[in-house]
Amino acid sequence: AVARYLSRYEGRMLVLEKAEDVCCGTSKANSAIVHAGFDAAHGSLMAKMNLEGNLMMPQLAKDLDFAFKMNGSLVVCMSEEDLPKLRALYENGVKNGVKELEIVDAKRLHELEPNVSKHAVAALWAPTGGIVCPFNLTIALAENAFDNGVEFQFNTEVTGFTWEDGFWTIHTNHGDFESRYVINAAGVYADVLHNMVSTRKLHITPRRGDYCLLDKNTGDFVSHTIFQLPGKLGKGVLVSPTVHGNTIVGPTAIDIDDREGTNTTAEGLNDLIEKAGATVEHLPIRQTITSFAGLRAHEDHHEFVIGEAEGAQQFIDCAGIESPGLTSSPAIGLHVSELMRDLMGLREKAHFIATRRGVLDPKTLSKEDYQQLIREKPAYGQIICRCEQVTEGEILDAIRR
């Protein structure tokens, strides 16, 4: 997101990516939720970026052609004793600027979601919550940045920094790179890079979240994203539809030491199934087609760290970007790009490319249009993946960009 919004300005920009492609870390292993913004502490940078990112997402989805749906969310309250917590969540959301929030009673809740537990007494309804495809969002941002001149260097791990004469030398496993400014967006490793240069140290704990993904025949089990009342470790285990028609269940919240620890555990999966089953009834967990785990970059103060690092001029942090990081990413990208504009005196490009064409999905076409597409491009008639009906044409489109 930072690269995409920075690409609006003149200048040479390079993304150093440790993995073989974009969207290989936390960006690919998360809940795929666009949060409304009622949970983050009022007055925090996290709350500000959450709301702004939520408001930006619909237009961004149109501009960059990725899947997004404003399906709304429900935070379910399971006891009368917890109603004050639900009310506090509502009031926090109102202070944060979230529109259309409403506390609904059990009758209205079960009209909205028949599969929610019969023991539920109320819920916080946020119609502005949504779901998104995190893979295509990330890829779309990267492709649009590339179209606007941003360079990418993959399989390149940063190992250190040297500051001299107003420039940073970035040391990597593929040689050195020199830049006036460094933007640190290294996820669970952001504190490691920050602590190499800053006098004020950060500490990030990898927080593992296990998930189950259910088959598409469960896609109408719930229509809203169903949350539990949030606790110290996050927003609890959710049950949500996905933009692809599946149901996703998760995550757990387990603090670990391993920054690459994305293995699932039987204990973690059993825990999330039990917790999800307390919120919804008859969860079709036997329809699970895969399980996975992702890591959240939990900063000790549970706050986004965005700005110039203390004692390290021209080194800009984007650290501690845990949930609602996906939702906040467009706002963070815009915020950092404007910060860089002011610091460097950047000029806007005369011909910025604001849109991007997504990979065509033939399943969205009418029968007649699909037949016409096959006549024009026969590769779209060759099914490579029969389960998901992925065609050769889609694969060729994706790899020839």
Predicted regions and their residues:
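Flavin-dependent oxidoreductases
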Residues: 161-167, 171-250, 254-263, 274, ...
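Short beta-strand to alpha-helix junction loop
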Residues: 41-51, 76-85, 124-146, 153, ...
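Glycine-rich FAD pyrophosphate-binding loop
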Residues: 7-29
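Helical element adjacent to the flavin cofactor pocket in flavoenzyme catalytic cores
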Residues: 124-181, 189
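Short loop/edge segments at beta-strand edges and connector loops
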Residues: 17, 70, 104-106, 154-156, ...
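Dinucleotide-binding Rossmann-like beta1-alpha1 core, especially the glycine-rich loop
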Residues: 32-112, 121, 236-237
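C-terminal catalytic lobe of FAD-dependent flavoproteins
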Residues: 97, 140, 230, 234, ...
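Gly/Ala-rich phosphate-binding loop of Rossmann-like dinucleotide-binding domains
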Residues: 3, 7, 144
